[in-house]
Amino acid sequence: MRRATLHGSDQSLRSIRRMIFALSFITITGGAILAQDATAPSVPVQDGAPAQDGVPVQDANTTREYRNTLRAIVDPQPLLADHPEFFEPIIERGRFEAPPIIDDPSGDLSVRAWRFSYNARGIIEMPNRIRADQTAIIMVHPWAIDDDWGWKSPQPNGVADFCTPEKNKLAARHTKEVIDPFLKRYRDDVAFVMYSLPGPADPIRTKVYRSFGKTPTAQERSAGERELRKRLADFDYRGEPLPDRLTLGPQQPVADYFRQFPGLDAGARFNNEGFWSLPIPVSTSIDVKPNDVVIFDDEGYPPLRDFLKANKVKHVLLTGYATDMCYCRTTAGYENLSKDFNVFLVADASLATFPANSTPRFAVNAAISFASLNQLITQVSWVHPIGESKTRSEAAAGAK
C-alpha cells in the first residue's frame, strides 16, 4: 500500500527528489557556509539593540533569528583533558565553532560550551556570555558516604553511592579536588550554590542546611549536626554475607544464578533494614556554607523550578553524580532542569558509575558524549569571568 501510494503521485515524488537534492547541495557546499564568520551575532528581530564589545545584546523579551553558521576548527585539541585521571578526553575529528546561543545583557561570566550533532558530522562549540547573578550552580547527590559524617558502606557486602568503599573514596577525592574549588570560586558571584539529596525535607537536615523555606540559625545548625551524627552513628551497618550456595534449575541455570546473586543488590539483605531511611548529609569533601541550599528529592521538581524562577535564575551550571543516573534523572537532574533553564553540564565536575573498572574515565566520557546530543557541555576551565584571559585548555580547544 505504501509503495502504491508513493508511485501514484509522480509530482510528489519529484518534489521529494528536489528536496533531497537541495539538502544534499547544502551539505556538499557546506564549505561556503563554514566560510562565514562563526562569531557573527544572531540577527535580532527588532533593530537598534544595544551592543557590548561589538556584539548586539538582546532584550530579555526579544526573539531573534539565530545564524546557524559553522566554521571548521583547524587542528582541534581534545576536549575535557584537564583531569585525565577522572575523565578520558574526548577526541572527535569534526569540530566547528558557531555563534553564541546566550549573550545576556551585562553578562559577566563566559561559558564556552559544545554539543554533538550527527547531522553536522561533528562537535559544535560556541562561546556564551551569561549573568552570574542569574545563575545557579547545582551539585547533584554529593552523598556523605564513608566520610567524617559516619554514614558508612554496610559490611561485609553492602553497597551505596559508587557501591564500594574504594570507589566512594575516589569520588570523594574528585569532589575535593575538582568540584569544591569550582564552588568556592563562584559562590560569591552566582545566585545560589545548591546540592540535591535523596529523601524528604526531614526535621534533622532542615536544621543543618538551608532549604527552600528555611534558613537555620547557627544554634539550629549546631544542634542539627549533633542529632545527625548521632542518628548515623546509632545505625548497625552490618548486612548478610554473600550466599555460599545457590539453587540452579536444569533449564535456565544462568537466569537462576543471576536471580539469586545479582551484580547489584542495595536492599536490606546486604545493607540492613533502615539503611536508606537514614538522613544523608552533604559530603565533607565540600566546604558547605550557611547560604548554600539543599534540594530534597522527595519534594519533586516543581518546588525547585519555582524557587529558581522566583529568584530570577535563568542558567544552571550542573555538577555532581552519577553522570549516567542521578545526574540526569533525579529531581535536580538535567532532564528536568533543561525544560525550564539554560543548562550547562560541567562535565569534568561529574563522574559516572564504573562497574568492572578501576577508573571512571571511560564511563563518564561515554555518558557525557551521549548527553551531548541534546545538552550543552562545558568544563571547569571554560567557565571564567568576562575579561579574564582564556585558560590554556580553552584557547587550545578553540584554536583555528
Regions found by a protein language model. Name each.
Residues M1-I16:
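N-terminal secretory signal peptides that target proteins for export/translocation
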Residues V43-Q58:
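Long, intrinsically disordered low-complexity tandem-repeat segments
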Residues P165-R173:
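The substrate-binding groove and active-site-proximal loops of carbohydrate-active enzymes
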Residues F192-L197:
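Short beta-strand segments at enzyme active-site cores
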